[in-house]
């Protein structure tokens, strides 16, 4: 579990390797990740957009931008939470994801919230150290 808090918005990321959707011999690996967003502040906020940076073990970087998450732009009142699960494929058995959400406060202010960097690793993979 990976967690970051920005301006009283807490984001927790929990990745999980999905073996049944992966074909390691073909260079296809798939992870599901669950994100929980909690409003610890005193003002309602809306998640308006996302920006992901996905890096594989070869250093190949893919950036993903889009409105909301999983087709929604959730509103979180004070104390409110929103959770969703999505997925990401990689051609390598390890990688890392990070990013941010653009939020709109009920006051009209916009701000970015960090999504903590989280590791994408095939479980039980032998590690080679140089």
Swiss-Prot record:
Classification via NCBIfam families: PRK05461.1 (NF003967)
PROSITE patterns named among the record's database cross-references: APAG (PS51087)
The species this protein was found in: Azorhizobium caulinodans (strain ATCC 43989 / DSM 5975 / JCM 20966 / LMG 6465 / NBRC 14845 / NCIMB 13405 / ORS 571)
Protein name: Protein ApaG
InterPro entries noted in UniProt: ApaG_domain, ApaG_sf, Uncharacterised_ApaG
Gene3D superfamilies referenced in this protein's UniProt entry, alphabetically: ApaG domain (2.60.40.1470)
GO biological process: error-free translesion synthesis
Residue intervals of the ApaG domain: 3-127
Coiled coil residues, start to end: none
């Amino acid at each position: 579990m990976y967690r970051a808090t920005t301006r009283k918005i807490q984001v927790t990321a929990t990745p999980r390797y999905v073996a049944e959707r992966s074909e390691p011999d073909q260079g296809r690996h798939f992870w599901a990740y669950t994100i929980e967003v909690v409003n610890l502040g005193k003002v309602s906020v809306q998640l308006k957009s996302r920006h992901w940076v996905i890096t594989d073990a070869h250093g190949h970087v893919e950036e993903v931008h889009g409105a909301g998450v999983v087709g929604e732009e959730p509103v979180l009142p004070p104390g409110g939470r929103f959770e969703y699960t999505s997925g990401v494929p990689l051609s390598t058995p390890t990688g890392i994801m990070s990013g941010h959400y653009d939020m709109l406060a009920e006051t009209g202010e916009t701000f970015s919230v960090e999504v903590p960097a989280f590791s994408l690793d095939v479980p039980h993979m032998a590690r080679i150290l140089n």
